[in-house]
C-alpha cells in the first residue's frame, strides 16, 4: 500500500491499488463500560484531580481497566469475556485521533487468479522475482554443508564424577558457568543435563544458544530440558500458554535485559551452530511446525525423569541453580521421590540483608529494596525449594558482589590458549565496557558473580578457602511486589540451610581462568568462522563424530 500510494505525488488521500481508504476518528480502547466511575484499576483517573493526558471523564478511557486474564469484572455469567481493552474503535471528541484507514481490500484484478485479493497476488509476485534472491538456509549457502553431532565417549574407568544437573535462566553469567562446568574433569563433575528456565533473563528461543555452546564443546550428548514459561501461579489455568508477567516484567527488554541475553550481547552468532534446535509441531500443541516437526523439545520434567531412571543410590544428583527456581520447584512438587534422589542443591541467588543500607539488586522495582532477582522472579518457587528441607547451600548476592571484572580479566589476559577462554574473555570484556560506559548497564557486574556457584562446585576448596555458616531462613511470597523474594532469618520456624559467606577471590580467579585455559576437554570446533571453513571444504570424515576425552 505504501509503495503504491507514494507513486502518485499528488495523492493526499492515500489511494492505492490494494485497499480502499477513508479518514476516520479512532482510538485504542483502554477501559470498559460503565465509563466515568472512579475505578482503582484506572491509573489515568484514580486519585487524580486532573486526568492524565487531559482525557475526558466519561470518555472511552475512563472506565474499568482489565486486571489479568481472569478479571472477574470482565467475565460474564456465560463464561465469555466482555472487556474490550486493546480494541481499535471509531469514536469522536478529544479522546480520538484522525487517521487514514484501509477499510476494505480490493479484489484481484486477475479474474483467473485463485486468490481473491489484489495484494495477495502482488505479494507473491514480488517474492518470486529473481532479483535480490536470498539464500535462507545453510545447505544452499555452503557447498559442503553437513550436520555433525559430537558425542563424548566417556571411558568407564574415568567415570565416577559427581552427577550434576545445571538449572540456568540463560543470562550471560550462566553461559560463563556452563563453559566452566564443561571444563571440569568428568572424574570430578559429570554434567548429566541442562535445564533452562525461561522465567529469568532470556526468552525461550535462547535455548538454541545453549545447544550451540554444547556443540562447540563436543557435548551434544547432554540433554537440555525446557522449563515453564511462567512463574508458579502466574499462568492462565484454562489456557496455560498465556499468563501474567507480574514478576518477569522486572527484567528490562533492552539495556542488559532480554535483547542482550537472547543475543549473548552480540556474540551468540560467533558460536558454531549446532544441529540441535528448539523443535515443536502442531501435533504437540504448537501454533506451527518447526523445521523438524518429527522432533520435539524435551521439557525439564521429562529430562529429569529420564535422568532419575539412570542413577542409583550411590550416585545421587547434585543440582546447581543459576536462575529462578521454577523448574526445581516443579520437580520437587511433582516427583515425590526427588528428596531421596537429590544429594544437594547449590543455589546462586538470594539476599539476606544486614541492615537498611544492605540492599538487593531489583533495580527496576523501586518499592522492593531487599530482594534478589532469582528469588523475586518466582518467589513461590523460591519458597518451595528453600523451605523444602533439602540439603541446600546458598551463594547469596553479598558473596557474589565481591567479584571484580578487572581482576578476572587481568588473569584471563595472561593466557588464553583455548577457543573457550578467548570467547569468555571477549564476553567479559564487553560486559565490563558496557558497565563502565553506559549508565543503563550498571547492573552488568551481577552476571560476573553468577560464576561463583560453578567454581565452588567444581573448584579446589583448598584454593578457594570457603567460609560457611548455617542459618534458619524463610522466604516471603505473599503476592506483594514490594516484599516478594525477601529472605528473612527465622530461628524459630525457619528451614536450615548453609550459606557461602566468603571465598578467596584470587583463588576463584585462578580456578576459573586456569580451567578454561586447560587444553583437556577443550572445544571441538572453536567458532562459527571455523565451521564456515569446514562447510566450504570437501568432507573427509563421517557426519556423526564421536570424541573421546583425553
Swiss-Prot record:
Q: A Pfam family name for this chain?
A: IU_nuc_hydro
Task performed by this protein: May be involved in the degradation of nucleosides.
Q: What is this protein called?
A: Nucleoside hydrolase 4
Q: Species name for this entry? A: Arabidopsis thaliana (Mouse-ear cress)
Q: Which PANTHER family match?
A: INOSINE-URIDINE PREFERRING NUCLEOSIDE HYDROLASE FAMILY PROTEIN (PTHR46692), NUCLEOSIDE HYDROLASE 3-RELATED (PTHR46692:SF1)
Family per UniProt?
Answer: Belongs to the IUNH family.
Please give the Gene Ontology molecular function terms for this protein. hydrolase activity, hydrolyzing N-glycosyl compounds
Is Transcription given among the entry's keywords? no
Q: What is its main location?
A: cytoplasm
Amino acid at each position: 500500500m505504501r509503495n503504491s500510494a507514494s507513486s502518485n505525488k499528488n495523492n493526499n488521500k492515500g489511494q492505492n491499488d490494494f485497499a480502499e481508504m477513508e479518514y476516520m476518528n479512532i482510538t485504542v480502547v483502554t477501559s470498559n463500560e460503565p465509563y466515568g466511575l472512579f475505578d482503582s484499576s484506572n491509573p489515568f483517573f484514580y486519585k487524580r484531580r486532573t486526568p492524565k493526558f487531559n482525557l475526558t471523564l466519561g470518555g472511552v478511557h475512563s472506565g474499568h481497566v482489565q486486571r489479568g486474564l481472569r478479571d472477574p469484572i470482565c467475565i460474564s455469567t456465560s463464561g465469555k469475556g466482555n472487556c474490550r481493552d486493546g480494541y481499535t474503535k471509531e469514536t469522536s471528541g478529544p479522546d480520538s485521533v484522525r487517521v487514514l484507514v484501509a477499510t476494505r481490500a480490493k479484489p484481484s484484478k486477475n479474474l483467473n487468479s485463485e486468490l481473491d485479493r489484489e495484494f495477495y497476488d502482488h505479494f507473491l509476485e514480488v517474492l518470486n522475482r529473481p532479483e535480490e534472491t536470498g539464500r535462507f538456509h545453510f545447505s544452499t549457502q555452503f557447498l559442503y554443508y553437513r550436520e555433525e553431532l559430537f558425542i563424548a565417549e566417556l571411558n568407564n574407568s574415568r567415570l565416577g564424577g559427581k552427577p550434576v544437573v545445571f538449572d540456568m535462566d540463560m543470562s550471560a553469567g550462566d553461559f560463563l558457568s556452563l563453559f566452566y562446568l564443561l571444563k571440569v574433569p568428568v572424574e570430578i563433575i559429570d554434567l548429566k543435563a541442562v535445564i533452562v528456565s525461561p522465567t529469568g533473563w532470556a526468552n525461550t528461543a535462547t535455548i538454541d544458544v545453549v545447544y550451540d555452546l554444547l556443540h562447540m564443546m563436543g557435548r551434544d550428548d547432554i540433554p537440555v530440558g525446557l522449563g515453564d514459561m511462567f512463574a508458579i501461579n502466574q499462568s492462565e489455568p484454562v489456557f496455560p500458554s498465556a499468563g501474567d508477567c507480574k514478576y518477569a516484567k522486572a527484567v528490562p527488554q533492552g539495556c542488559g535485559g532480554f535483547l542482550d541475553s537472547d543475543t549473548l550481547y552480540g556474540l551468540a552468532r560467533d558460536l558454531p551452530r549446532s544441529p540441535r534446535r528448539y523443535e515443536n509441531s502442531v501435533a504437540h500443541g504448537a501454533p506451527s511446525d518447526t523445521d523438524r516437526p518429527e522432533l520435539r523439545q524435551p521439557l525439564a520434567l521429562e529430562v529429569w525423569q529420564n535422568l532419575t531412571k539412570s542413577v542409583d543410590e550411590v550416585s545421587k544428583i547434585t543440582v546447581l541453580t543459576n536462575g529462578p527456581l521454577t523448574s526445581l520447584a516443579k520437580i520437587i512438587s511433582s516427583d515425590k521421590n526427588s528428596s531421596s534422589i537429590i544429594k544437594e542443591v547449590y543455589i546462586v541467588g538470594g539476599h539476606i540483608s544486614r541492615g537498611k543500607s544492605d540492599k538487593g539488586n531489583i533495580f527496576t522495582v523501586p518499592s522492593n529494596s531487599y530482594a534478589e532477582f532469582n528469588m523475586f522472579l518466582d518467589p513461590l518457587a523460591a519458597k518451595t525449594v528453600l523451605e523444602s528441607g533439602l540439603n541446600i547451600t546458598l551463594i547469596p548476592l553479598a558473596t557474589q558482589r565481591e567479584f571484580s571484572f578487572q581482576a578476572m580479566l587481568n588473569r584471563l589476559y595472561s593466557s588464553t590458549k583455548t577457543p573457550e577462554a578467548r570467547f569468555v574473555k571477549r564476553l567479559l570484556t564487553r560486559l565490563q565496557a558496557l558497565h563502565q560506559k553506559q549508565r543503563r548497564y550498571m547492573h552488568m557486574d551481577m552476571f560476573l558473580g553468577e560464576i561463583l556457584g560453578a567454581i565452588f562446585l567444581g573448584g579446589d576448596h583448598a584454593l578457594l578457602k570457603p567460609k560457611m555458616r548455617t542459618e534458619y531462613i524463610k522466604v516471603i511470597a505473599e503476592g506483594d511486589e514490594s516484599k516478594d523474594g525477601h529472605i528473612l532469618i527465622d530461628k524459630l520456624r525457619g528451614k536450615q540451610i548453609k550459606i557461602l559467606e566468603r571465598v578467596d577471590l584470587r583463588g576463584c580467579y585462578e580456578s576459573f581462568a586456569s580451567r578454561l585455559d586447560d587444553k583437556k576437554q577443550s572445544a571441538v570446533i572453536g567458532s562459527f568462522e571455523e565451521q564456515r571453513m569446514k562447510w566450504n571444504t570437501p568432507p573427509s570424515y563421517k557426519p556423526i563424530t564421536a570424541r573421546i576425552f583425553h
